[in-house]
Structures are given as C-alpha cells and as structure tokens.
Amino acid sequence: AFIWAFTTYFAEGFPYSLIRTISTFFFRASGVSLEATGLTSLLGLAWIFKFLWAPYLDFFGTKRKWLLLTQGILVVIFCLITLSAGRSWALPFVALLFFAASVIASTHDTAIDGYYLEALDQAGQARFVGYRVMAYRIAMMFGSAVIVTLGARNGWPVAFGLSSFLLTLLFFFHLFFLPSCEYEKKPIKALIKKLISVPHLIVLLLGLVLLAAILLMDRSRAFLGSLP
C-alpha cells in the first residue's frame, strides 16, 4: 500500500499542477496577453462542479477502472499537447485540450479518492493521511519547479513530453500493479449508452452551451485576439 498510495496521489497532484499552474506559464510564454491568460482560471471549474458527475463513479464500473480510464485519457491529451505546444497557430486547440484535461483530471481525482477509501480500512486510511498529502505536494512542486524550468530552458514540447512520459509510466504501473478491491454494479459501457441517448445528449449539449455563453461570451474574443 505504501507504493500505490504514493503513486496514485502523485498521479492526482501532477495533472492538477499541469492544468492549473503550468498552463498559465505556457500561454504567457507563447505570447498570449495577461488578460486572456486569466481565462485559465476557468479550468478550475471542473473541480468545483465535479460533484455533478461524481456519483456515476459509484454506480458504474469500479474506482480502479475509472482511475485507469481517466489516466489513459490524460496520457493521450498531454501527448496531443506535446505535439501542438510548439505551434502558435495551434494555441486555441491546446486551450481546448487543457479544458478537456481539466474535466478528465477532476474525475480522475474522484476515482483515486474513492479507490483509497475502498482499498483501505479505517486504520489504513488514517495511517496514510499525511503520506498521501506528501505525495500530492511533491507532484505539485515537481510540476511547478521542474516542468516550468524545463519549458523555459528547453521549450514547452520537451516539458510536456516529459510530463506525458511520466503519466504513461504511472498508467502502466497502475495497470499492472494496482490491486482490485471491489466489484462493479454496472459496466462503464452502460453509462456510455445512457449518455449518448437522445434526451441526455440534448441536456448535455444545452448545458455546455449555456455554461459557455455565461462564462466566455465577453472574454473569448480577448483570448483569440491576443494570439501571436
């Protein structure tokens, strides 16, 4: 438990650092205006509103499956960011990728916290409280110090490339060594079928449009107009 308690919470803190902190440095270094860079604060909304979809992780699949699924998606997203980071014309696409990453990473956090509660009894949970916080903080410091420095000195494709590689290592470690500790009530594919049904899809699209209109209507032009 000492090993996976560290790696899972490192894997929780590292994407958060990439999305909430390092993205700001990246966009500023890419020539985006300070006002437009302030839009990166909206990436934190996923962690605020994750309670809306967090219950689905209890009813579909297992926390381990959700953990692996979201980690795998994060690997793909940051590989795409790596390939796009050195191209100024791709900055809107990178911004969209960071938004997608924020939703996936917040879900990933929920899966990790849930797995921790499922895999350990109360005594074990109490024993690792400080330990998992330490792992999370180390990940945050690694991102803020090492990745930012690497991006400034060697270029952001290199920095995000290292980030993608590290996330890939964590994914495969958890895939092969993270123990199973619960039975799923319903498969994840049942949730996917439910979400793509017409009524749910309409509600989802309307919600996204409404959220985008409220939050971005007055500021999206500032972001696009500041691109080099």
Task: Give the residues covered by each predicted segment.
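Helix-loop boundary and gating motifs at the non-cytosolic
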Residues: 1-47, 213-226
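Hydrophobic core of transmembrane alpha-helices in multi-pass small-molecule transporters
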Residues: 10, 77, 89-108
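Transmembrane alpha-helical cores of Major Facilitator Superfamily
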Residues: 10, 39-45, 72, 99, ...
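Intracellular juxtamembrane helix-capping segments at the cytosolic ends
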Residues: 23, 105-120
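Helix-to-loop junctions at the C-terminal end of transmembrane segments
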Residues: 48-62, 151
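C-terminal ends and interior cores of transmembrane alpha-helices
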Residues: 68, 72-89
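Intracellular loop-helix junctions on the cytosolic face of multi-pass helical membrane proteins
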Residues: 85-93, 122-228
